């Protein structure tokens, strides 16, 4: 997870032409839309597809969620901290 969050932050700091990540980082609405689409795909996979497909769709959801966090200058660490605070 650290490697992926570092890559996304690096794309934001050092954009690469043609990068899908950069396209999402430049458009918060598009990033949010992709999170919604991927969440729907996770639900569909969980209800009617293979375990492998569930894992693939969940990976897509996590990636797009991390990009959306980065558009808001938030991080995976912020999410982990919120989860930890819920269990105190």
Where are the language model's segments positioned?
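Flexible "arm" and connector segments at domain edges
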Residues: 1-58, 62-88
